[in-house]
């Protein structure tokens, strides 16, 4: 584990919640600029999902939802991760994703589900966000 103190180590990567509110694209750019190879977080198994949820519940200040790196770039329900990892696990909240009013193409962790489940959201919404890095 080479993660700095306030990062969550998991499966060879490090994760950190940033509490400043940003639109999805700005959050992804922030993660990328933080260090080469960083992105908004991708989640691939239920266990990771739970560990991340627990970490966010401990360290997230405020009520904002939390961006992760999943988005519908083509706007056709073909979800992809910004780190280009495979979309092999999805943890949608009920009746999600719904592209509500054909405006929701970015994915957030839902605070009401303890950050365990996901929903699509308007990409311009300002949220806290979860970066993933290798150190």
Curated annotation (Swiss-Prot):
SMART domains: CLECT (SM00034)
Annotated tissue distribution: Expressed by the venom gland.
InterPro entries: C-type_lectin-like (IPR001304), C-type_lectin-like/link_sf (IPR016186), C-type_lectin/snaclec_domain (IPR050111), C-type_lectin_CS (IPR018378), CTDL_fold (IPR016187)
Glycosyltransferase as UniProt keyword: no
Chain span(s) of sequence motif Galactose-binding: 96-98
GO cellular-component term (any): extracellular region
Subcellular location: Secreted
Ranges where the C-type lectin domain occurs: 10-132
Keyword flag Disulfide bond: yes
Alphabetical UniProt keywords: Calcium, Disulfide bond, Hemagglutinin, Lectin, Metal-binding, Secreted
Induction notes from the record: Hemagglutination activity is inhibited by D-lactose (MIC=1.75 mM), D-galactose (MIC=0.75 mM) and D-raphinose (MIC=3.5 mM). Is not inhibited by D-glucose, D-sucrose, D-maltose, D-mannose, D-fructose, D-threalose, and methyl-manopyrosonide.
One Pfam match: Lectin_C
Listed GO MF terms: carbohydrate binding; metal ion binding
Intrachain S-S bonds: 3-14, 31-131, 38-133, 106-123
Sequence similarity: Belongs to the true venom lectin family.
Function, as annotated: Galactose-binding protein which recognizes specific carbohydrate structures and agglutinates a variety of animal cells by binding to cell-surface glycoproteins and glycolipids. Calcium-dependent lectin. Shows high hemagglutinating activity in the presence of human erythrocytes, which are agglutinated with a minimum hemagglutination concentration (MHC) of 2.5-0.35 ug/ml. Causes indirect nephrotoxicity. Causes reductions in perfusion pressures, renal vascular resistance, urinary flow, glomerular filtration rate, sodium, potassium and chloride tubular transport.
Note, other: Negative results: does not induce direct vasoactive effects in perfused arteriolar mesenteric bed, and does not potentiate bradykinin contraction in the ileum.
Name of the protein in its database record: C-type lectin BPL
Organism of this sequence: Bothrops pirajai
